[in-house]
């Protein structure tokens, strides 16, 4: 699982011109699942560890302006948006290959499980895009602060 984490002042997702989800200050996270993740990945330690890392990253300023607070501590929102292109390979040619991404039916189950786990950890503070939809994602970056998390770096499968 790969996450592109962006600290935002606000973010929203729309599909076909209709608002689907929005948050005020918090994190907008683009989420991709790899072919090696497998359908049982969400139930395993790597997925949970990556989610915990995300929720506990100290990337919000304290009273002194030091990046010392996590999303949990600030009470901010979390907006999760599926994006299989995080597994694009540009090694050959000019057209990206997406063969390293999880198949859509597997990724959908993993994405839904991740959204559910995040919702349990942050009740009432999690929004999500529409899996597989062509979405319009709007955000106001704060900082900017952008971090890449990969479950493989945290002991995960991919």
UniProtKB/Swiss-Prot annotation:
GO terms for molecular function: D-tyrosyl-tRNA(Tyr) deacylase activity; Gly-tRNA(Ala) deacylase activity; Ser(Gly)-tRNA(Ala) hydrolase activity; tRNA binding. Pfam families: Tyr_Deacylase. Keywords: Cytoplasm, Hydrolase, RNA-binding, tRNA-binding. It catalyses: glycyl-tRNA(Ala) + H2O = tRNA(Ala) + glycine + H(+); a D-aminoacyl-tRNA + H2O = a tRNA + a D-alpha-amino acid + H(+). Its EC number is 3.1.1.96. GO terms for biological process: D-amino acid catabolic process. A Gly-cisPro motif from one monomer fits into the active site of the other monomer to allow specific chiral rejection of L-amino acids. Belongs to the DTD family. An aminoacyl-tRNA editing enzyme that deacylates mischarged D-aminoacyl-tRNAs. Also deacylates mischarged glycyl-tRNA(Ala), protecting cells against glycine mischarging by AlaRS. Acts via tRNA-based rather than protein-based catalysis; rejects L-amino acids rather than detecting D-amino acids in the active site. By recycling D-aminoacyl-tRNA to D-amino acids and free tRNA molecules, this enzyme counteracts the toxicity associated with the formation of D-aminoacyl-tRNA entities in vivo and helps enforce protein L-homochirality. Homodimer. This is D-aminoacyl-tRNA deacylase. The lineage of its organism: Bacteria, Pseudomonadati, Thermodesulfobacteriota, Desulfovibrionia, Desulfovibrionales. The gene is dtd.
């Amino acid at each position: 699982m790969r996450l592109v984490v962006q600290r935002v002042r606000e973010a929203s997702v729309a599909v076909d011109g209709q608002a689907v989800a929005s948050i005020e200050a918090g994190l907008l996270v683009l989420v991709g699942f790899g072919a090696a993740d497998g359908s049982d990945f969400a139930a395993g330690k790597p997925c949970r560890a990556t989610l915990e890392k995300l929720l506990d990253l100290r990337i919000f300023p304290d009273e002194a302006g030091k990046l010392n607070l996590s999303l949990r501590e600030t009470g901010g929102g979390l907006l999760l948006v599926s994006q299989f292109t995080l597994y694009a390979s540009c090694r050959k040619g000019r057209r990206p290959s997406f063969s390293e991404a999880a198949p859509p039916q597997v990724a959908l189950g993993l994405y839904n499980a991740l959204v559910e786990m995040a919702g349990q950890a942050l009740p009432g503070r999690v929004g999500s895009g529409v899996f597989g939809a062509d979405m319009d994602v709007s955000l106001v970056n704060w900082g900017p602060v952008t971090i890449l998390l990969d479950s493989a770096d945290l002991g995960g499968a991919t």
